[in-house]
Amino acid sequence: MSISTGEPRLAVEPAALRAWVEGRTIYVELHDGRIVGFPADRFRILAAATEEQLARVQVELNGYALRWEELDEDITVPGIVAGHFQLPPK
């Protein structure tokens, strides 16, 4: 049995602690311990990037975005976790 205080619960958006690339898959370790991965080919700009360019991913905005400076590409971590991709799977 749960007891409700009547106070709204604040939703916590997923945030990244770190990000890395293996081959053409980008992995993100989230603050809650989960690790999610997605193929670079699900985003237009990343699909055209080299593996070396993909490997230069940075975690930005307190963990709420991934940034590829050289590619001028930003992807939100909550969007990744929710499965919001630009392109369908191949």
Model-derived regions: residue spans:
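Motif-centric detector for short Cys/His coordination patterns
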Residues: 1-90
